[in-house]
Each structure stands twice: as structure tokens, then as C-alpha cells.
């Protein structure tokens, strides 16, 4: 009888120990992705693919072969992604390279670090343009045109560089000459949250050389910027998009380039990741970081 009791106790302790190990074991990856309509999400999903299927195909319901992982977060801003990743050791997400600070760690992708050189020569694959959107029919108010001219000038390029963004090599910046206005003008810019920091800086610099134009800023996301330009028949709105999505409603004008950085918590030992591994993480085929060699 005593022997039976000893065996039962030993068995219970073994089960309890296994359960404790399980509770304290490695947790699943917390997948962080931007909300639908985000230019950052569009740029990321166009590139991340497997077997000819992109994450964008999943977003647009063009495939039933794969689906997104169930356990995920979809914050509506760059700051939201950074907050989640910086506070969770098991999180992974993606943000504008210019937004990466000490609170998150950017991974190399396929062994390539996101830099000015690797973006301009195309070696770093997850990249996108920062676009200024104007009406396709050419309608634009003089004040909106003046702000557009400033943004495309050599003066603006200095501020773009200071934000860690990348000069678009196929465009030669011009010289800005402020237009003259007899009365105070007001224009609107609307769109990508990823472009908020650089555009706020450009608006501030513009105000110092053009005191007669007030620029009202709104950042509802890239899709919101596209809609704002389409809906403003007067051409007094300049849209902001952080991914290309051609349309007959607007013209895309490249302000600069940006890398979409894949980020993890600084405590994560992972340093490199492949496109295929990213696809598997975002579709749930890979659930733990220990399944990745990087």
C-alpha cells in the first residue's frame, strides 16, 4: 500500500513539474501588423510571399490557400506598433525605418541591412516610396502648388535627410521660390501616419519661408489621403501615401524613399530573417522564435 502511495505521489509530482515547465516555456510569437489601408502594410505585404502568393493576396481575398494568423494585433499607427513590440519580448512587427529607435531592434532581411545604399540599389527588398498625391486631371490651387514646389526642392531635401529618409535617385530637386499671395491661404495635406514626422517638419520649414499659406495636417492613413484628393475637386488637398497604388483619380509623385524595417524587442536574440520566414510567421505556420534560425 505504501509503495502504491509513493508511486502515485511521484506520478503527481511529475505531472505538476511538466505543467510548470509548460507554463514557463516559450510563448507564441505576437504578430503585429498595421490596419487595412495602411501604406506600410501595403508595402510589406507586396513583398512577403510564398509559392507565388503574397500577404497582399490574403488581405484582398485573392487566395484561400493561406490565411493570417489568428493571434495578432493591428494598431492604427506606427507608434502603436512600436509600443507593442517594445513592451513584448515575443512580438514582431514592421515600421518605417526612420521610426526605429532604441526601444525596438531592426532585423536584417535575407542578410541585408536596411540602409540608404541598399534601398537605392534595390538590395533591401522591403521598401516603398513616400508619395505626394495630386489630382490626375491637373487641378491644383496656387497655394497647394506652392507647397508642393517647396516639398520637391533642395531646401526640403535637407529636412528629408535629417529624418533618416532616403533621397529618390531619379529626381533632381529644384530651387524653391516662394509665390506671392495678397491674402492668407489655407491648404490641406492628408494621409500616411508614417509620413507624419517628415511632413510636420516640412510644414514648419515651409511656414518660415512662406508666411501667407497655412497648411492643415491630417493623418488618417494612406487610403484616407487617396480619398481626400479624389474628393477635393478644387485641388486644394495634397495626399500622402506610403505605398504605390495607381489610380485614375490621382497622380503619384515621389518625395523620397523609405525602408520598411522588420522589428522585434531588443531582448530578442534574433538578428536576421528571411522573406519566407516572415510569410510563415504572419500566416501562423511558425509560432515560436525558436523555430527560426537567424
Regions found by a protein language model. Name each.
Residues 19, 24-294:
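Exported/periplasmic ABC-transporter solute-binding proteins
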Amino acid at each position: 500500500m505504501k509503495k502504491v502511495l509513493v508511486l502515485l505521489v511521484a506520478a503527481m509530482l511529475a505531472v505538476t513539474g511538466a505543467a510548470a515547465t509548460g507554463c514557463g516555456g516559450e510563448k507564441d510569437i505576437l504578430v503585429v501588423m498595421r490596419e487595412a489601408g495602411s501604406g506600410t502594410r501595403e508595402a510589406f505585404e507586396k513583398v512577403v510571399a510564398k509559392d507565388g502568393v503574397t500577404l497582399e493576396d490574403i488581405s484582398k481575398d485573392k487566395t484561400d490557400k493561406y490565411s493570417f494568423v489568428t493571434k495578432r494585433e493591428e494598431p492604427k499607427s506606427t507608434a502603436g506598433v512600436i509600443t507593442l513590440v517594445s513592451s513584448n519580448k515575443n512580438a514582431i512587427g514592421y515600421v518605417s525605418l526612420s521610426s526605429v529607435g532604441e526601444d525596438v531592434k531592426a532585423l536584417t532581411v535575407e542578410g541585408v541591412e536596411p540602409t540608404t545604399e541598399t534601398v537605392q540599389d534595390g538590395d533591401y527588398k522591403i521598401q516603398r516610396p513616400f508619395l505626394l498625391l495630386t489630382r490626375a486631371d491637373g487641378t491644383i490651387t496656387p497655394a497647394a502648388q506652392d507647397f508642393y514646389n517647396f516639398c520637391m526642392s533642395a531646401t526640403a531635401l535637407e529636412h528629408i535627410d535629417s529624418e533618416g529618409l532616403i533621397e529618390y535617385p531619379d529626381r533632381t530637386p529644384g530651387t524653391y521660390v516662394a509665390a506671392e499671395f495678397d491674402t492668407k491661404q489655407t491648404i490641406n495635406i492628408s494621409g500616411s501616419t508614417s509620413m507624419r514626422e517628415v511632413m510636420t517638419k516640412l510644414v514648419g520649414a515651409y511656414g518660415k519661408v512662406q508666411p501667407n499659406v497655412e497648411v492643415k495636417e491630417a493623418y488618417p492613413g494612406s487610403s484616407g489621403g487617396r480619398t481626400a484628393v479624389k474628393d477635393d475637386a478644387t485641388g486644394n488637398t495634397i495626399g500622402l501615401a506610403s505605398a504605390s497604388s495607381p489610380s485614375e483619380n490621382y497622380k503619384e509623385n515621389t518625395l523620397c524613399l523609405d525602408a520598411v524595417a522588420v522589428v522585434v524587442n531588443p531582448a530578442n536574440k534574433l538578428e536576421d530573417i528571411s522573406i519566407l520566414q516572415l510569410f510563415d510567421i504572419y500566416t501562423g505556420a511558425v509560432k515560436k522564435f525558436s523555430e527560426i534560425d537567424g
